[in-house]
Amino acid sequence: MNIKTGGCSEDCSYCAQSSRYNTGLKASKMVNVESVLEAARIAKENGSSRFCMGAAWRDMRGRKTNLKNIKAMVTGVRALGMEACVTLGMIDAEQAKELKDAGLTAYNHNVDTSREHYPSVITTRTYDERLATIKNVSEAGIHVCTGGILGLGEKPEDHVGLIHTVATLPTHPESFPVNALVPIKGTPLGDSQVIKFDAILRTIATARLVLPSTIIRLAAGRNTMREEKQIMCFMAGANAVFTGEKMLTTACNGWEEDKEMFEKWGLRPMAVEETIQGQQEAAEKVKVDLSKVQASEFSTKAEASL
């Protein structure tokens, strides 16, 4: 869900939300907490296990009120029994800690492409600044969600470079989103050719080999693929999708459409208790229950000795 639309100061060549381009998108203030939680409830009712929230701005500097509201959104989403993910641009170590304390499951901050091709796409934020945010997120104990966009005018070796960057992080990310550029009129990449499907498939398959435990998420551009192509992506190694009304500002496959596809091809959506967050919480519960048993045994022994 886009919790704050447009008006971003960055110059990402692919993005409709940049204030530098005339895309017809109207900027808006951040939505209220309750509207986010209502959207999360609907997502859960339709089978989603994770709710993702994105805000269009460069970073979180000077946004204390926004951060307070976002933490309330995160806590509220978690109270619904869902995982919570946000993408808020660059954040520092203290902001990452605050989000972790609020219950944040994952933080999305894509590296977008290879280090070599990156300057051709964005000039207002460096590659190393992106990696610094990923480091802050990881060190705060939040799961990292980082991937890229295919179709930015890159070469095949840039797909290798993208995967190499992610695979050589100190710890492999929990999630690797694979986006296919949706050209938006008014942006510098608005007239770009659509990326060939075999490039998407090769990227997914390669990522699966070098990131064996990472969730590979089909993200933007999936709605442009025919059903059989989406299934080929799953066969190549993808094992999650973004679904719902919109993928930030671009169209997204709907819940009913995805449910029909999953049922047709024998794909079972992951239950909340099967997610990484769910498994961790189950493990913590076991620890708590075990400590109670041990405390009870100690108390019984103490009484017997008396």
Predicted regions mapped to residue ranges:
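Local cysteine-cluster metal-coordination motifs and their immediate loop/turn environment
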Residues: 3-19
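Glycine- and other small-residue-rich loops at beta-strand/loop junctions that grip anionic moieties
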Residues: 1, 88, 126, 148-151, ...
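Hydrophobic faces of well-ordered beta-strands that scaffold small-molecule active sites
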Residues: 1, 51-53, 84-86, 107-109, ...
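Short coil/turn connectors at secondary-structure junctions
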Residues: 9, 46-49, 80-82, 212-213, ...
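Glycine/charge-rich, flexible interdomain linkers and switch-proximal surface loops
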Residues: 1-4, 94, 225
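Auxiliary Fe-S-binding modules of radical SAM enzymes
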Residues: 167-306
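Conserved Radical SAM active-site core
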Residues: 20-147, 151-168
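Functionally engaged cysteine thiol sites
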Residues: 8, 52, 85, 145, ...
